[in-house]
């Protein structure tokens, strides 16, 4: 990510105007607070001091450190001046952790104020509470940005919050699960959706993808794929580190794994198409470390082949770094559940009725019936030690 990645997108809009719009997002009635002595008025003044133009610039600048680990934002097209303010504020909260402008207590205070505002204004959050589905035909980009804001804040509360804040989001995890269902994140968009991307649909590459190539549609679908992987990893990590109940069944995640970094970081439509291989193998020279596949495997598909529940061998160079990391976490979660099943063979496991244990059952079957090979022996010995 460039150091000045967000500067130049809208040079006619000074940063103090961006800061003011973020403040208005949190306090839409701020003209009424100027002469008050209420708690809301004090909160407004506190947030006003934090969200100065210079601080917003600093926080967005520092967000690049987080982005290098979790590239959810499409930097080439992201414009903080026109993006959802809740998403920009969530990015500022994360950037503030890396900045020396604020202490931990101030960062956590900022996190709470931002989350309150995001929950009040998020349309997809309101739809999820009412168990309704978002309109992905006409509001896909807006819905995705709202979910990005909610998920980034959830992650920050979980890993950077105080003990009380961490418990708060662990208690609210059901609401986040409802949001993912409302946005239909774990399944590809239907083929008749005007925003659907051919390269994010199941099935082999047919060649028609070259004629139907649309960079904007590809970006929006790739955002959803990366967001899905991120949400699943948060849930799996919470299960592993905090012993919480898993919320998602990996077998139901049919969106593809994230595409190669070279495609996601491409600055133009043509560069992205070349990195995907739509312009032939020779044009993929800049995609040095990825899978070089126009389509990625789905997480459920990849794990099914790995644990032997599906026929065939795992394709060579089938995943990139992001995909490998996602599968390793998912496999760790499956292994954890397998230990529970194996440790109590005569006692029903309380998690067996939960859909997330389907993968664990598949691996248990694989361990029991599949001859041990060199690649599988490490797993067999690990499970034997746990019994």
Residue ranges and their predicted role:
Residues 139-140, 165-168:
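Short, charge-rich binding segments
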Residues 105-112, 167-168, 209:
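Short sequence/structural elements of tandem HEAT/ARM alpha-solenoid repeats
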Residues 1-86, 90, 94, 113-130, ...:
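Intrinsically disordered, low-complexity activation-like regions
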Residues 99-106, 162-165:
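Structural helix-adjacent loops and short alpha-helical linkers that scaffold large soluble proteins
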Residues 141-144, 149:
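Internal alpha-solenoid helical repeat scaffolds
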């Amino acid at each position: 990510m460039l150091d000045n990645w967000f500067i130049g997108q809208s040079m006619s809009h000074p940063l103090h105007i961006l800061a003011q719009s973020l403040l208005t997002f949190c306090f839409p009635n701020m003209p009424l607070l100027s002469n008050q002595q209420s708690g809301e008025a004090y909160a407004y003044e506190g947030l006003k001091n934090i969200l100065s133009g210079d601080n917003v610039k600093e926080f967005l600048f520092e967000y690049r450190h987080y982005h290098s680990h979790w590239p959810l934002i499409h930097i080439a097209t992201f414009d903080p001046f026109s993006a959802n303010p809740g998403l920009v504020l969530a990015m500022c909260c994360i950037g503030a952790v890396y900045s020396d402008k604020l202490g931990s207590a101030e960062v956590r205070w900022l996190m709470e104020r931002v989350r309150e505002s995001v929950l009040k204004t998020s349309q997809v959050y309101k739809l999820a509470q009412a168990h309704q589905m978002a309109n992905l035909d006409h509001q896909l980009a807006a819905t995705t940005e709202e979910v990005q804001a909610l998920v980034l804040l959830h992650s920050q509360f979980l890993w950077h919050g105080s003990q009380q804040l961490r418990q708060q989001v662990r208690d609210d995890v059901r609401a986040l699960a409802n949001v993912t269902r409302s946005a239909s994140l774990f399944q590809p968009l239907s083929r008749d959706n005007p925003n659907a991307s051919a390269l994010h649909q199941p099935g082999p590459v047919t060649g028609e993808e070259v004629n139907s190539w649309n960079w904007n549609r590809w970006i929006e679908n790739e955002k959803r794929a990366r967001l899905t992987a991120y949400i699943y990893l948060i849930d799996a990590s919470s299960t592993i580190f905090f012993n919480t109940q898993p919320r998602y069944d990996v077998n139901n995640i049919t969106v593809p794994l994230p595409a190669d970094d070279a495609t996601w970081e491409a600055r133009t439509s043509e560069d992205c198409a070349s990195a995907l291989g739509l312009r032939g193998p020779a044009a993929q020279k800049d995609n040095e470390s990825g899978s070089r596949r126009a389509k990625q495997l789905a997480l459920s598909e990849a794990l099914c082949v790995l644990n032997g529940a599906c026929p065939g061998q795992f394709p060579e160079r089938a995943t990139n770094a992001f995909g490998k990391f996602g599968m390793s976490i998912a496999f760790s979660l499956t292994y954890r559940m397998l230990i529970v099943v194996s440790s109590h063979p005569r006692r029903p496991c309380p998690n067996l009725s939960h859909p997330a244990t389907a993968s664990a059952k598949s691996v248990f079957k694989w361990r029991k019936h599949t001859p041990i090979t060199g690649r599988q022996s490490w797993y067999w010995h690990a499970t034997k030690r746990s019994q």
